[in-house]
Swiss-Prot record:
<keyword id="KW-1113">Inhibition of host RLR pathway by virus</keyword>
<keyword id="KW-1048">Host nucleus</keyword>
<keyword id="KW-1090">Inhibition of host innate immune response by virus</keyword>
<feature type="compositionally biased region" description="Pro residues">
    <location>
        <begin position="1"/>
        <end position="12"/>
    </location>
</feature>
<feature type="repeat" description="12">
    <location>
        <begin position="151"/>
        <end position="156"/>
    </location>
</feature>
<dbReference type="GO" id="GO:0039540">
    <property type="term" value="P:symbiont-mediated suppression of host cytoplasmic pattern recognition receptor signaling pathway via inhibition of RIG-I activity"/>
</dbReference>
<keyword id="KW-0426">Late protein</keyword>
<comment type="function">
    <text>Plays a role in the inhibition of host immune response. Participates in the inhibition of host autophagy by interacting with and inhibiting host PKR/EIF2AK2. This interaction also prevents the interferon-induced shut down of protein synthesis following viral infection. Downmodulates the host RLR signaling pathway via direct interaction with host RIGI and IFIH1. May also participate in nuclear egress of viral particles through interactions with host NCL and regulation of the viral UL34 mRNA.</text>
</comment>
<dbReference type="GO" id="GO:0039502">
    <property type="term" value="P:symbiont-mediated suppression of host type I interferon-mediated signaling pathway"/>
</dbReference>
<feature type="repeat" description="5">
    <location>
        <begin position="109"/>
        <end position="114"/>
    </location>
</feature>
<dbReference type="GO" id="GO:0039580">
    <property type="term" value="P:symbiont-mediated suppression of host PKR/eIFalpha signaling"/>
</dbReference>
<keyword id="KW-0238">DNA-binding</keyword>
<keyword id="KW-0945">Host-virus interaction</keyword>
<keyword id="KW-1035">Host cytoplasm</keyword>
<dbReference type="GO" id="GO:0030430">
    <property type="term" value="C:host cell cytoplasm"/>
</dbReference>
<keyword id="KW-1114">Inhibition of host interferon signaling pathway by virus</keyword>
<feature type="repeat" description="10">
    <location>
        <begin position="139"/>
        <end position="144"/>
    </location>
</feature>
């Protein structure tokens, strides 16, 4: 019986951590590329800009630096304005010819109006004459007392029989 080696402790960058294959650059935990004793030993996928001096400071991940001065060309379909499909016009019935209208009289410019002449000031409105008291209404005939409805069984809760 052959002796088996005891399993080695699993550490960052060990191929045993991953399911199969050699760990690619994207599979390393985040602290792997940091120099030994680097304060940033964080596990997780590598972030562009973690150890990239060109990425700038203050959380600039460096992703926007790819081609800041180059313009991304759009496909030609995106530039063309969309064409609205036109429905073919349905020919209308031919118009019935009308007899020609009699010519209108040419419009004559109106004579300029004089400024408005103020009306004669009226006396302030006279107070109304007091109303004559109305004649008292004829008294209505007394109402008949309302008759109670036909007697029914007292209502019970729904479904109760």
């Amino acid at each position: 019986m052959s002796q088996t080696q005891p399993p080695a402790p699993v550490g960052p960058g060990d191929p045993d951590v991953y399911l199969k294959g050699v760990p690619s650059a994207g599979m390393h935990p985040r602290g792997v590329h940091a120099p030994r004793g680097h304060p940033r030993m964080i596990s997780g996928p590598p972030q562009r800009g973690d150890n990239d001096q060109a990425a700038g400071q203050c959380g600039d991940s460096g992703l926007l630096r790819v081609g800041a001065d180059t313009t991304i060309s759009k496909p030609s379909e995106a530039v063309r304005p969309p064409t609205i499909p036109r429905t073919p016009r349905v020919p209308r019935e031919p118009r019935v010819p009308r007899p020609p209208r009699e010519p209108r009289e040419p419009r004559v410019p109106r004579a300029s109006r004089d400024p408005r002449v103020p009306r004669d000031p009226r006396d302030p409105r006279q107070p109304r004459s007091p109303r004559e008291p109305r004649s008292p209404r004829e008294p209505r005939p007394p109402r008949e007392p309302r008759t109670p409805r036909t007697t029914r069984e007292p209502r019970t809760a729904r479904g109760a029989v």
